[in-house]
Curated annotation (Swiss-Prot):
Name of protein: Ribosome maturation factor RimM
GO molecular function, one term: ribosome binding
A Pfam family reported for this protein in Swiss-Prot or TrEMBL: RimM
Organism (species): Syntrophus aciditrophicus (strain SB)
Domain-related comment: The PRC barrel domain binds ribosomal protein uS19.
Length: 166
């Protein structure tokens, strides 16, 4: 079974083992179907847990795991990475992508000129914006069909058309 990172535990939250974690998933991603998680702390072996509850809130999520029911047990996991099975990811339509899959993609123009790599992504009211860095300058690319022509996750490449002003 393949797992992917969804966040890092930053602190305990409350008295019953609830934890607050910095989220690596975009706000609004549905995590309600997550029933198990792997927790990895440093170079230790991953440990599997049943998920009681997971709630996404802005750039964080709150996590409750079976057997983690005290402040002390939650505190012992601070700094750990939280991973969930690939199968627990919500299905996306053909033109939608998880942010984590876009991070690091090589960005090239339709003429083949290298611009950089996707370094970060942020939402706006109408569409996401991809931050491309590593070339001659940082470029903000709106996630619209006029700009983003093709995304090839197998080649780890995004082909773009630069509009005037970009």
């Amino acid at each position: 079974m393949k797992f992917f990172e969804i966040g890092e535990i930053v602190k305990s939250h409350g008295l019953k083992g609830r934890m607050k974690a910095k989220s690596y998933v975009e706000n609004g991603e549905d995590l309600s179907s997550v029933h198990e998680a792997m927790i990895v702390k440093g170079k230790e072996e991953p440990r599997g847990y049943k998920v009681r509850k997971i709630v996404l809130h802005k750039t964080y999520f709150f996590l409750e795991l079976e057997t983690i029911d005290t402040v002390e047990s939650a505190d012992s996991l601070v700094g750990s990475t939280v991973l969930i099975p690939e199968d627990d990811r919500a299905a996306l339509s053909g033109d939608e992508y998880y942010w984590r899959d876009l991070m690091g993609l090589q960005v090239v123009t339709e003429e083949g000129r290298f611009l950089g790599r996707i370094e970060s992504i942020f939402p706006t009211g109408s569409n996401d914006v991809y931050v491309c860095a590593g070339g001659s300058r940082e470029i903000l690319l709106p996630a619209i069909s006029d700009v983003i022509l093709k995304i090839d996750l197998d080649k780890k490449e995004m082909v773009v058309r630069l509009l005037p002003g970009l």
